[in-house]
Amino acid sequence: MKSLVIAEKPSVGRDIARVLNCKKSGDGCLEGEKYVVTWALGHLVELAAPEAYDKKYKEWKMETLPMMPKPFKLEVIGKTAKQFNAVKRQLFRNDVKDIVIATDAGREGELVARFILMKAGCRKPIKRLWISSVTDKAIKDGFSRLRDGREYDCLRDAAMCRAEADWLVGLNATRALTCKYNAQLSCGRVQTPTLAMIAGREEEIRNFRPKSYYGLTARTSSPSLSLTWEDQKSGGMRSFDRERMERLLKELRDQPVKIVQVKRTPKKTMTPLLYDLTELQREANKRFGYSAKETLNIMQRLYENHKVLTYPRTDSRYLSSDVADTIKDRLAACGIGPYRKLAARLSKQTWTKKAAFINDAKVSDHHAIIPTEQFVQLQHMTVEERKIYDLVVRRFLAVLLPAAEYDETVITAEIGGERFTARGKVMRTQGWREAYETSAGTDSGADSSFLSFDDLDDETDEEEERGGAVRVKEQTLPDVKEGTVIAGAGLSLTEGKTKPPAPFNEATLLSAMENPVKYMESHDKAMAKTLGETGGLGTVATRADIIEKLFSSFMLEKRGKDIFLTSKAKQLLKLVPEDLRKPELTAEWEMKLSKIAKGELKRDAFMGDICAYTEELIGEIKGGEGTFRHDNLTNTKCPRCSKRMLSVKGKNSQMLVCQDRECGYRETVSRTSNARCPKCHKKMELRGKGENQTFSCSCGYKEKLSNFKERRQKEGAGMTKRDVAKYLNKQNQEEKMVNNPFAEAFKNLGLDKQ
């Protein structure tokens, strides 16, 4: 008799099959003496669409709402039906005695496998593989300690509750809003609060009124010293009272400088934490301009294809004690090229399980992202993969190094009874900073855009920026003694203005989604704690998709790197019920889902509350008195229905979309390409259709697509006609993916998945 192993993806299935010596190819599987390994393609089964319950739901009508299925049905996803049938045949083989769930170790991974088993009607015994990386060693260790599947029944219940609750609230609210206002409007408990946070930031910026502030600087030439005035009452370095500062300037001029204190304090900067996915996405956006989705895709390749990094969709920044035992193996694997010298030195050390980066209590499903024990071939990676790999390896090396130590010197002086200070820093030991220096051993193939110490250690406090706080700039300080009197200081008045909060970009929006507590109106400490523990709005696995889909549904637009709401999103926030705009809804759900996963709350009790809430929500939408106005109507008529089309701006394209939701026609007017302008090297837009497609740059340069192809070939840039065609085909496929805005909106209600 054999065990059937169900992996989440083919690549993981093949890795498991290789380790288990399953070499015989079968019907959507690989087979060995003891195991048969098959795989899903992500989700193969999902909750059924409304029309599966009643034909009346095919038409979107307010009178059919709310839709309340009892029980919920499952349906096979059409495009993956072939693989589902292959898995089902393996499930019911006479020689298969039990099932090993080897999908991702987490709530959604559990749901992938359980939905398959439920839809297939398979009731064979279940075992669970729970691992954080797919290296051979991790797989072997995992199979040596398989767990009873019944231990995860509560996790399954929590996953099903999350899916069903999102279906009830998301689909019903979206249909109600769309029918009520005759516009393509979708909402959900994650995407809508995300929009509300951006709206709040935009309002802060609109309402901001800059205030001028003033300070004093005293400079001496012998010794060379720059001193900053400090308010003796508040300790601040600036004042909003110009008259006071001008008066002080006159009073203190030509007064001697007396050094009253020279204080040297030994200090440390602790090692930064390891990366979880959100922190890595933030860093990649800040350093390289990668979107959250791009970073996740790159990470996925490094995890699945290269197998050099651990599981990417983690929300932990720590390692478990069992993983700590493998550090030397990981150093040996990543200790090549630019990391060789430092990795070799570190491999001679030992680490206790009391190290700051080891904390079993802060690792749930998966530990932080670190290198695997797999041998690395940097030459097989793309430039983008190298950059992300470099971030992770250097952070891994950094946490194995001690704190950076330095002496901070603060000179306090008096001029006419007023206090002035100067600050300087002298490094004593580099500590973890060594991992971010070229002295770690870069080679010709290494990317030059590594993080510097300042990038990591000098995070500007947003509240200080808003308030116009002034920091004393560090400088190389002269050797002066207390009691020294210096004559001839030059005083000058400094002036600045308070700054508004910056608009969100992808990095800061990810931070806000991860920590939305300050955007909560409620002061409920339990809710705030839950949002903190569960990772805020969405999960590390879904935030990138949520942001991307808000762009594709024309709720967000980019101006440079900054993100802004479209008119559509602003109107939606006025029309949607207040509950759906608040992070508190997610916090409340997560508190209950966490209890379900622990066996402390029954599934039926939670779903009863959700059904009641859905009824209340739809009633509120039905009774709404607002209106929706298309303020982006053009004079271009839809070629299908002749109605005027809407001009909409996506993340990387300008489009015309039919205003009639039933028609759904759309066409691309222009899209940002990766082709660079030969004059100014900015990215060019591709406009037009067919043979008339033309690249256009903001500097005024234009070039037909046909000429572009010829030029690229002549330049020997490595882009053939086939490459260009492949690129354009990819752009077209992306366009097709959103060609039916209605189908997309509701198919993707899962964008609120946890």
Please name every model-derived segment.
Residues 239-273:
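Metal- or metallocofactor-binding catalytic centers and their adjacent structured scaffolds
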Residues 306-307, 554:
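Glycine-centered, phosphate/nucleic-acid-interacting loop/turn motifs that mediate DNA/RNA or nucleotide
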Residues 1-163, 456-459, 500:
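Intrinsically disordered, low-complexity regulatory segments
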Residues 94, 114, 138-220, 264-268:
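C-terminal or mid-to-C-terminal helical accessory/interaction module adjacent to the motor/catalytic core
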